Amino acid sequence: MSAEPHHLYSQLPAIDSLLRAPEMAPLLDEYGAALLTENLRLMQAEAREYIRQFHTLADWCADWPAALRHRLNQRQPALKPVFNLSGTVLHTNLGRAPLAESAIAAVTDAMRGAVTLEYSLSGAGRGHRDRAVADLLCELTGAEDACIVNNNAAAVFLMLTVMAAGKQVVVSRGELVEIGGAFRIPDVMRQAGCELVEVGTTNRTHLKDYRQAISEHTGLLMKVHTSNYSIEGFTASVAEQQLAALGHEFAIPTATDLGSGSLVDMTRYGLPAEPMPQQLIAAGVDLVTFSGDKLLGGPQAGIILGKKQWIDQLQQHPLKRVLRADKMTLAALDATLRLYQQPDRLTELLPTMRLLTRPAQDIAESAQRVLAALNGSYAADFTLAVESCWSQIGSGSLPVDRLPSWAVTFTPKDGSGSALEALTVRWRGLAKPIIGRVADGRLWLDLRCLEDEAALLRELAP
């Protein structure tokens, strides 16, 4: 089609007339007039620019409703499901722990309507939003009380603010951790109005170091679990029971930030040991903080357990309202914790435990099936193989421990890194993107977290 540009401009339909067209009715019902109007204005601008450059109408101008629907279908949700084949089970950038079906159902129910978030059915009056979940946590850990906030960083910040603002906090030099996003314990203390007092050395700290640091300005003795790194060799550290006894001797509270935190003995499932909150409560620690979405396998949340006198102060502080968890978080956390009342079924019901304990042989068999299905489609450009590899737990949990796994690897036949880059870019653009990892000149798809082979193969079908 050819015509003068000014003539073509006049052929562009008005937005009002487009919105009144019968073909637009389904789109109006689905998306609303405001969104359609915004997109039609953009399309008009693009059509004018096309006329200016090429002196013709763009092909899509022949059917504006179809072009608009195509455009709207390309809109991406803010959070998009992906296949996590990275080899990191609790991948922070991919949302950490997948929720159990019971937790998903609980969140769905909580979203549908009114719930007893802060309402007491027994007294027909105001209740406390943490109460039901706190009671369950106390049952599972032996703590006197519990407090729930929106993540563990918030839990640590609230704890420091309440227990030690304007005072000194004594911490071993070897426990001044930094986690992802440049979250550093010294920085958090500074923001909470605390003064950090470092004791010991990077690799060795003794009880006498804490004792010598205590003064009339001391507000808290604190331990931080080094969940995302390990110091090995010539080392020494102080057990929580010893530190708690020292704190009681001087009437100074003690606290431990576990970071990850597991409510079950991981060695029971053939996994490396991880400190459990209930062990620290039994050791006499006044407050313990840990995450809900790491080894616990629940939603993002910060959990604080311990002595009721301190939990009461946390609950009454204005900062608690700023950091409190919403009804969806509490519903998911409650449902997740209830699974721990059936420890013999955890690997069946809790996805995090199921993925962490998945037998290597099962993963290897899955890898062989995936290889057989994909080899014909990719053999021209890549050499595909099944190779053993090591998965990691992730999210700063058990940093030096690895889980034996198996992967399908893609090695470019021309040895080109650009071929791998093109493949990963293409897979990230799929309806359900595939996230692997590139190492040693090939792309690795670690299948530990793959539970729907058929869905993966549908995405990768030519």
From Swiss-Prot:
Organism domain of life: Bacteria
Residue positions where N6-(pyridoxal phosphate)lysine is found in the record: 294
UniProt record, GO biological process: conversion of seryl-tRNAsec to selenocys-tRNAsec; selenocysteine incorporation
HAMAP family: SelA
Job description of the protein: Converts seryl-tRNA(Sec) to selenocysteinyl-tRNA(Sec) required for selenoprotein biosynthesis.
Main localization category: cytoplasm
Protein location: Cytoplasm
Cellular component terms (Gene Ontology): cytoplasm
GO molecular-function terms, A-Z: L-seryl-tRNA(Sec) selenium transferase activity
Complex formation: Homodecamer; pentamer of dimers. Binds only one seryl-tRNA(Sec) per dimer.
Cofactor: pyridoxal 5'-phosphate
Family to which this protein belongs: Belongs to the SelA family.
Pathway: Aminoacyl-tRNA biosynthesis; selenocysteinyl-tRNA(Sec) biosynthesis; selenocysteinyl-tRNA(Sec) from L-seryl-tRNA(Sec) (bacterial route): step 1/1
Name the UniProt record assigns to this protein: L-seryl-tRNA(Sec) selenium transferase
Catalytic activity: L-seryl-tRNA(Sec) + selenophosphate + H(+) = L-selenocysteinyl-tRNA(Sec) + phosphate
InterPro entries membership: PyrdxlP-dep_Trfase, PyrdxlP-dep_Trfase_major, SelA-like, SelA_trans, SelA_trans_N_dom
Keywords (A to Z) from UniProt: Cytoplasm, Protein biosynthesis, Pyridoxal phosphate, Selenium, Transferase
Record EC number: 2.9.1.1
